[in-house]
């Protein structure tokens, strides 16, 4: 069994904002190494229930072993958290007391060479979080049009050299398919002028991020998962999301603000006719970040941003 050595970020902050209590029902939509899940179970003892989602079967199995001491207080679901409403309905749960989404790729997935998430090692260009899914990064790289490749790399990677990288990919794949991570890295390095390489950022970072997001439909999943999670919250229940790059954080911020907004009528209309009521109260005006102590012991936490809401 793969050992998911994943250090959970912002552990104290997650518990403070989620505020688990005995008897509560909580969803960890991104179970991963089960670090946050264990904290939630301990805080909601003796009878709190945790439903853990992960589309990565390897992660789910490993988490199941780690959480075995909690027995029937844990329910595992192999599914993307975007479908949490449907999945919970299937097991008869209509409302929850809280949910957590810690989005993005896990340290273990990056370190598992054969998964193809990392540009540091040579491996098949895969990047699927759900290994039963059909589309791999290699398929996108070798089949998308130059225009679509450019759009994916620019929008999901926020890469200024997207057009040039897409053009170089097309040229290379006309000679031979791009099948491995390092083959793609070579193309990207050739496309991005050396003078534009950033000191602390590998030139392939943004393109690999973009492809991973596209392969796993991460942004749409986040938006759907957040909205679905809020709908399931009981009054006073809380939702917490941790993101690691600006695209994810922007979605969390926008979604939560929209759900917290009341009347959406134009200002020139003196009386509300839309009937829209706020669903949540935003608990974090600005995103919560890791302190210096955590960053020094877990550098990955440096880019973590936590936002939270409470159902009203």
UniProtKB/Swiss-Prot annotation:
InterPro entries, sorted: RsmH, SAM-dep_MeTrfase_MraW_recog, SAM-dependent_MTases_sf
Presence of the UniProt keyword Chaperone in the record: no
Residues where S-adenosyl-L-methionine binds: 34-36, 54, 81, 102, 109
Example GO molecular function: rRNA (cytosine-N4-)-methyltransferase activity
GO biological process, one term: rRNA base methylation
The reaction(s) this protein catalyses: cytidine(1402) in 16S rRNA + S-adenosyl-L-methionine = N(4)-methylcytidine(1402) in 16S rRNA + S-adenosyl-L-homocysteine + H(+)
Keyword Transmembrane helix included in the entry's annotation: no
Gene Ontology CC: cytoplasm
Keywords assigned: Cytoplasm, Methyltransferase, rRNA processing, S-adenosyl-L-methionine, Transferase
Subcellular compartments: Cytoplasm
E.C. no: 2.1.1.199
Entry similarity comment: Belongs to the methyltransferase superfamily. RsmH family.
Family matches, as PANTHER family: 12S RRNA N4-METHYLCYTIDINE METHYLTRANSFERASE (PTHR11265:SF0), S-ADENOSYL-METHYLTRANSFERASE MRAW (PTHR11265)
Task of the protein: Specifically methylates the N4 position of cytidine in position 1402 (C1402) of 16S rRNA.
Entry protein name: Ribosomal RNA small subunit methyltransferase H
The species this protein was found in: Geotalea daltonii (strain DSM 22248 / JCM 15807 / FRC-32)
Chain's gene name: rsmH
């Amino acid at each position: 069994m793969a050992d998911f050595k994943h250090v959970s970020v912002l552990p104290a902050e997650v518990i403070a904002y989620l505020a688990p209590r005995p008897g509560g029902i909580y969803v960890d939509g991104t179970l991963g190494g089960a670090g946050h899940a264990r904290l939630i179970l301990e805080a909601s003892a003796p009878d709190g229930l945790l439903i853990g989602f992960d589309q990565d079967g390897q992660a789910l199995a490993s988490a199941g072993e780690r959480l075995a001491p909690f027995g029937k207080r844990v329910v595992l679901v192999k599914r993307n958290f975007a479908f949490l409403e449907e999945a919970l309905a299937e097991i008869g749960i209509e409302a929850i007391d809280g949910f957590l989404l810690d989005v993005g790729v896990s340290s273990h997935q990056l370190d598992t060479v054969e998964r193809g998430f990392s540009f540091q090692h040579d491996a098949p260009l895969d990047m699927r979080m759900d290994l039963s899914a059909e589309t791999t990064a290699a398929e996108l790289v070798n089949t998308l049009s130059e225009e679509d490749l450019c759009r994916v790399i620019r929008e999901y990677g926020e890469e200024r050299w997207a057009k040039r990288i897409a053009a170089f990919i097309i040229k290379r794949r006309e000679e031979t398919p791009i099948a491995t991570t390092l083959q793609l890295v070579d193309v990207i390095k050739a496309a991005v002028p050396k003078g534009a390489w950033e000191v602390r950022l590998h030139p392939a970072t943004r393109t690999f991020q973009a492809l991973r997001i596209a392969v796993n439909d991460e942004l749409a999943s986040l938006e759907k998962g957040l909205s679905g999670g809020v709908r399931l919250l009981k009054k006073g229940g809380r939702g917490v999301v941790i993101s690691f790059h600006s695209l994810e954080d922007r979605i969390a911020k926008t979604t939560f603000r929209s759900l917290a907004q009341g009347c959406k009528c134009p200002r020139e209309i003196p009386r509300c006719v839309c009937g829209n009521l706020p669903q949540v109260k935003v608990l974090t005006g600005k995103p919560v970040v890791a302190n210096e102590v955590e960053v020094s012991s877990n550098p990955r936490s440096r880019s973590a941003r936590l936002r939270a809401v409470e159902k009203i």
